Amino acid sequence: MAQEITKRDTDAPPSARRLVILAEDDTAFRGLIASVLEREGYEVVEAADGVALLASVETALTIRRERADAFLVVADIRMPGLSGLDVLAILRCASCATPVILITAFGDEATHAEGRELGAAAVFDKPFDVEQLRSAVIETMPPW
């Protein structure tokens, strides 16, 4: 299958990457999402909890300054340590505009509302169609 080349791809600096930082405490589910995104051409950094997610975001922000990487976060809402909502709140308090897509097995309206209030680009309830998440990542990924 031929990969469609977009203007975004051709504008990228030679060393730049399209990076997704994926935080999900279910190892098998995290692996499934990662494989779908990697087939789409994204580099995926996996984190098993919110603390590892926050550390990965800090690293990506530092590298982005040097290499002009484009990246976003996909995070489970309920994880050990810091939740996806906690990490999103920390990023927004630090004036970090990194796009965040949230996923959750506990998708009540209050959870969705809290995610939207904090600036989540999207909130997906588990189980969801991984192709819908893939589409959301494509639409949400910042330009180079």
Regions found by a protein language model. Give the residues of each.
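Alpha4 helix (beta4-alpha4-beta5 surface) of REC/receiver domains from two-component response regulators
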Residues: D86, G107-A122, S135
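Acidic catalytic/metal-coordinating carboxylates
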Residues: D49, S83-D86
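Non-catalytic signal-transmission and effector/linker regions of two-component phosphorelay proteins
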Residues: M1-I21, T27, G31-A34, E40, ...
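The feature encodes the CheY-like receiver
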Residues: P80
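Acidic, metal-coordinating helix/loop segments flanking the phosphotransfer/catalytic sites
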Residues: E46-L72
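A Lys-centered signature of the CheY-like receiver
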Residues: K126
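Short amphipathic alpha-helix used as the core "switch/output" element in two-component signaling
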Residues: L85-C96
